[in-house]
UniProtKB/Swiss-Prot annotation:
Compositionally biased region (Low complexity): 190-215, 297-307, 460-474, 481-498, 531-590, 617-656
Coiled-coil intervals, chain numbering: 86-139
Coiled coil among keywords: yes
Polar residues: bias regions: 263-276, 308-331, 520-530, 591-602
Protein name: Uncharacterized protein MAL13P1.336
Annotated source species: Plasmodium falciparum (isolate 3D7)
Documented applications: Possible candidate for an effective malaria vaccine as determined by epitope response in sera.
Comp. bias (Basic and acidic residues): 115-127, 165-181, 499-515
Length: 685
């Protein structure tokens, strides 16, 4: 053995003596260990080291392995376990860094490599023995035919208690690598090809044959077991495992009745004539009829129109809650006030948060037969004003009789009068001021020689009439709802806008540049939720009232005279001063396209300025804009942003309609007008 030599002369002799003693002891242990086969077997099971792990270990750096077997038989001279990590006591520490060739520490692992190779050879010999035993076992299987009549192929009889069979049985019990010899004892396999009705009989015959031959069951089984075709291979017992295995199959006494079929309510659909389904939106029609379930079919006795009952039978409970409301707009030509009368009963604070069933997009949902009878339209309004469902039927019948005699007198109804009063957008307390504003040369009036004109360009006024919020409860794009006096012939001013708004695709107007395009001015929002209460198709909302009651027309027209917006607390410009709004900053933005813009000193200077609060959080268009809950006018914000204060006379005041498609175009034009005010041209279209 090569070991580190110590320079010190005193220690050199001692090291040499220790090496000689170790070599002698190793030779003795080699001779003894070669004769012990038990150690070889134990090493085969316990030592799993190879050369690639042992090479590289030196005297000073060993592998910490607890070796069992030969190393434990070395006696007292062998070092203790883990000694490979311990350094030999040397006084000269300077030469510890110098190491010779790395070899196995024979002191800790004597003759380890030789013993491992011997173990490998012995294991290979054992495998050869097992292979021979496997061949012998196969011969036994061929000679022993267990379940036949007891004769093998050569005509010799075999006894189940013979040594050959017992050896095979013992071998299969302890050898896990050998295949299970139950394969030839699977009675279920032999009976699978037979009819299922004969399985038990065939199994009993096989068992009787085995018992008569005194062979018995080779593997310890119960002789009275019943084997069926559903027991898994290799299992014993009477429990079936196949698809016919159920925990318990019983009957309930008495037999339970069959489940009831789902209830289908086709009452509403039966009221839809087939000739009118073609041109209408079927989806919204079906949802509207399902929401308007009939309360009493006798309501239709006094009407030739069968679908009137489903329109009038809106549950009042839904009106008085924050839940879904059925806002009914019947005929395209009969612009009645059902939405307003429904929402009169809405509680404050709940209306804006609720998802309202919007039936406004369908021109003729409930009034399916297109009955151009104002009385049938007003029946819905009167029904919405009923707080007691018990009085609903009588009141409907009375109203049908009364309204047939008074077809043109819509404003005599209390509900219609109250709704026309609600159309005064902010429950205005000072109607004289509003009328004075209407008479002051079409919303232009002079104060301190400054010309003020309300336009669609107001940015500094909070709570404007139209909201850009998605969950807004105002009518979506209140288009030309209040035409005003003498404007009955201008019914088609917004047809182009309505056609564009009827399209279902989302044009992504808001997603381009919110601050420049949408919030730059207050325009309609085509991407607003479809669940909002909108008045999209009410092109001629109050023209029915214009025929008879001019006073109510004045009230409705005043909504638009106030700059075409819902100023709420700013119903007249005098109130603007009272609300801490400076005239120049508030109204200076209204001079962008007006004649006489130069007459308002410093007006256009504040055109695109925001106050400090609005610079931080653009609340002007996002907080409570047109939220009718604050003013008890839940649905009264129906201003006209396209038909401005001139009632369709666009040549007046150079004030043109503004659509959301025209925002960029008009914005560039307005910027040019700031630098170069346009000349007065009354003939400009």
């Amino acid at each position: 053995m090569e070991d580190k030599e110590v320079v010190n002369s005193e220690n050199k002799v001692e090291v040499i003596k220790e090496e000689e003693n170790i070599k002698k002891e190793d030779d003795v242990t080699k001779k003894v260990s070669e004769n012990t086969e038990d150690n070889d077997i134990s090493l085969a099971n316990n030592v799993s080291l190879g050369k690639h792990l042992l090479i590289g270990s030196s005297l000073k750096k060993g592998i910490s392995v607890s070796v069992r077997g030969r190393t434990m038989n070395l006696g007292m001279n062998a070092k203790q376990a883990g000694s490979a990590w311990k350094k030999k006591e040397t006084e000269n520490v300077e030469e510890e860094g110098e190491e010779k060739e790395k070899k196995i520490d024979d002191e800790s692992f004597p003759d380890l490599l030789e013993s491992t190779e011997k173990m490998k050879s012995e294991l290979s010999k054992e495998k050869d023995k097992k292979k021979k035993q496997l061949k012998d076992g196969k011969k036994v299987e061929d000679n022993v035919n267990v379940f036949n009549s007891g004769f093998d192929r050569g005509g010799k009889t075999t006894d189940g208690n013979s040594t050959e069979f017992n050896d095979k049985k013992k071998y299969n019990m302890y050898d896990g690598n050998k295949k299970n010899d139950n394969a030839f004892n699977k009675k279920w396999y032999n009976n699978q090809q037979n009819d299922m009705n004969n399985n038990n009989q065939n199994n009993q015959n096989n068992m009787n044959n085995n018992n008569n031959n005194n062979n018995g069951h080779i593997f310890d089984t119960n002789e009275s077991e019943e084997v069926t075709g559903y027991i898994l291979p290799g299992f014993k017992g009477k429990h079936m495992v196949g698809f016919t295995c159920f925990l318990k199959r019983g009957t309930q006494n008495p037999v339970p009745p069959p489940p009831a079929p789902p209830l289908t309510n086709n009452q509403g659909e039966n009221n839809i004539p087939t000739d009118n389904r073609n041109n209408e939106n079927k989806k919204l029609m079906n949802t509207n009829i399902k929401m308007n379930q009939q309360v009493d079919n006798n309501n239709n006795n006094n009407n030739n129109n069968n679908n009137l009952g489903s329109a009038m039978n809106t549950p009042m409970n839904n009106m008085n809650k924050g839940g879904p409301r059925n806002n009914v707009n019947n005929s395209e030509h009969m612009r009645e006030h059902s939405n307003h009368t429904v929402n009169r009963f809405a509680p404050m604070g709940q209306y804006a948060n609720s998802k309202n069933n919007n039936m406004n997009n369908v021109h003729n949902v409930n009034n399916v037969n297109n009955v151009n009878n104002v009385n049938n339209v007003n029946n819905v309004n009167n029904m919405n004003n009923m707080n007691n469902m018990n009085n609903m039927n009588n009141n409907m019948n009375n109203m049908n009789n009364n309204m047939n005699n008074n077809m043109n007198n819509m404003n005599n109804m209390n509900s219609m009068n109250s709704m026309n009063n609600m159309n005064n957008m902010n429950s205005m307390n000072n109607m004289n001021n509003m009328n004075n504003m209407n008479n002051n040369n079409n919303n232009k009036f002079n104060e301190n020689n400054i010309l003020y004109k309300g336009t669609n360009y107001n940015r500094n006024v909070k709570n404007l009439g139209q909201n850009n919020n998605e969950g807004n409860t105002n009518m979506k794009h209140g288009h030309n709802n209040n035409r005003g006096q003498g404007n009955n012939n201008n019914n088609n001013n917004n047809n182009n806008f309505n056609r564009r708004n009827d399209k279902n695709d989302n044009r992504n107007f808001r997603r381009k540049d919110i601050d420049l395009e949408i919030n730059w001015r207050n325009t309609a929002n085509p991407t607003q939720e479809e669940n909002n209460n909108n008045m999209n198709h009410n092109n001629n909302y109050n023209n029915n009232n214009n025929n008879n009651n001019n006073n109510n027309n004045n009230n409705n027209n005043n909504n638009n005279t106030n700059h075409g917006k819902n100023f709420r607390n700013f119903n007249n410009l005098n109130n603007m001063k009272n609300n801490n709004s400076s005239n120049n900053k508030m109204m200076g933005m209204n001079h962008m396209q007006q004649k006489g813009m130069n007459s308002s000193t410093g007006g256009h200077k504040y055109s695109f300025n925001k106050n400090d609060d609005q610079k931080n959080n653009n609340k002007m268009y996002k907080n409570n804009m047109g939220n009718a809950n604050n003013n008890n006018n839940n649905n009264a914000v129906n201003t006209n942003f396209n038909n401005n204060n001139n009632n369709g006379n666009f040549h007046m005041n150079n004030n043109k309609s503004i659509n959301s498609m025209d925002v960029k175009k008009t914005r560039m034009k307005d910027i040019r007008n700031l630098n170069d005010p346009p000349k007065v041209n009354n003939n400009e279209a």
